[in-house]
Swiss-Prot record:
Catalyzes quinol oxidation with the concomitant reduction of oxygen to water. GO terms for biological process: aerobic electron transport chain; ATP synthesis coupled electron transport. It is a multi-pass membrane protein. Its EC number is 1.10.3.-. GO terms for molecular function: cytochrome-c oxidase activity. Keywords: Cell membrane, Membrane, Oxidoreductase, Transmembrane, Transmembrane helix. It is found in: Cell membrane. Coiled coil: none annotated. This is Probable quinol oxidase subunit 3. It is an enzyme of class 1 (oxidoreductase). InterPro entries: Cyt_c/ubiquinol_Oxase_su3, Cyt_c_oxidase-like_su3, Cyt_c_oxidase_su3-like_sf, Cyt_c_oxidase_su3_a-hlx, QoxC, Ubiquinol_oxase_su3_dom. It comes from Staphylococcus saprophyticus subsp. saprophyticus (strain ATCC 15305 / DSM 20229 / NCIMB 8711 / NCTC 7292 / S-41). It catalyses: 2 a quinol + O2 = 2 a quinone + 2 H2O. GO terms for cellular component: plasma membrane.
Amino acid sequence: MSHDANTIDQRSHEGNLNKLGFWVFLTAEFSLFGTLFATLLTLQHGGDYAGKMTTELFELPLVLIMTFALLISSYTCGIAIYYMRKEKEKLMLIWMIITVLLGMVFVGFEIYEFAHYVHEGVNLTIGSYWSSFFILLGTHGAHVSLGIVWIICLLIQVAMRGLNKDNAPKLFIVSLYWHFLDVVWIFIFTAVYMIGMVFSG
């Protein structure tokens, strides 16, 4: 194991530049989700619900399962990065695989949730509130799915080439991306579901 004072994800100049670039990318992501949130919160008060009230449709147990899956995945991702910086490749791989599995649980339940709403006659086109709802959650879900694919690709690289100063910064960057999506979900859980379960229109 190297005794370099820097952790493995800090030993590549290119990797450090990529981290800086990713922070710039995240500001654009904040703007995107900020716009989607502002639209939904505006339509939450006075938007067209087409007679389909959130107080009747939202199911707390389902939302809690999704929330716990994503929040726990953030914790497991953090553990994976801890072991990455200790250069313990196998433990990093194990915890990242757990992160991916929890992410898949989240996406699976979100697909089930959307299918349930469609079965109840709710879709993207029936009212302005529901349009903003599906766009916000669909955008977040697509980002989570992208994150899962991204992590899997990096894990394949590590499995083939070993953990090194080139792929370690990428793992750190994807962990930032994953934590960002967890933060976005906390806002969704609070602003969309918690408010939606007690108020419609």
